[in-house]
Amino acid sequence: MPGGLLLGDEAPNFEANTTVGRIRFHDFLGDSWGILFSHPRDFTPVCTTELGRAAKLAPEFAKRNVKLIALSIDSVEDHLAWSKDTNAYNCEEPTEKLPFPIIDDKNRDLAILLGMLDPAEKDEKGMPVTARVVFVFGPDKKLKLSILYPATTGRNFDEILRVVISLQLTAEKRVATPVDWKDGDSVMVLPTIPEEEAKKLFPKGVFTKELPSGKKYLRYTPQP
């Protein structure tokens, strides 16, 4: 598991300096979902492509009541200067403003607290840098998803958006999403729901795939 947080743990209510000023994390989240994601260093190629894609997708996350906040071991001043490069990469006006804040963790306090450091990747002083961690928190401030990539492999933010849509759907409805599921695809009825109850819960219908075992656990229904 990435770092010091396990699924179901409450997010630490830390304070930090960011590109939009000082924040307290729980106040920043409010009643929203939240994604806290770390990157190794500013002014590096893979990180620029990642935050560029996150910026492009920010409106899609916002539509779903999801707040983004990034973190690295660089200073606020570096974050702001690098934001110009990131916007230029996106063929946008090279301003210091991204659609989400970036946390200044130059002392590595949060990276240590949250277990975000990559021991295999070090800076010019021989100190470990932050790995590519993703934490998704629900409106209850509890961890719903964690992903850990090494510094050398960029993340897929379209996949992170897909997962968030699944998390929100399955938090509200008694369904699960199958392999390669996309928003709008059929979903799976939880195996703990009796057949008669499933018919009432899912008026659009329930399709059961016949299997050699004779067990009726592969049940699909249109996305509620």
Swiss-Prot record:
GO cellular component: cytoplasm; cytosol; lysosome; mitochondrion
Family annotation (SUPFAM superfamilies): Thioredoxin-like
Family statement drawn from the similarity comment of this UniProt entry: Belongs to the peroxiredoxin family. Prx6 subfamily.
Protein name in the entry: Peroxiredoxin-6
Site for Important for phospholipase activity, residues: S32
Record region (Required and sufficient for targeting to lysosomes and lamellar bodies): 31-40
Disulfide bonds: none
Species of provenance: Macaca fascicularis
Residue span(s) of domain Thioredoxin: 5-169
N6-succinyllysine found at: K209
Keyword Cytoplasm applies: yes
Record-listed Phosphotyrosine modification sites: Y89
Record keywords: Acetylation, Antioxidant, Cytoplasm, Hydrolase, Lipid degradation, Lipid metabolism, Lysosome, Multifunctional enzyme, Oxidoreductase, Peroxidase, Phosphoprotein, Redox-active center, Transferase
Post-translational modification N6-acetyllysine, affected residues: K63, K209
Entry keyword Cell wall biogenesis/degradation: no
Record-listed Phosphothreonine modification sites: T44, T177
Main location as per UniProt: cytoplasm
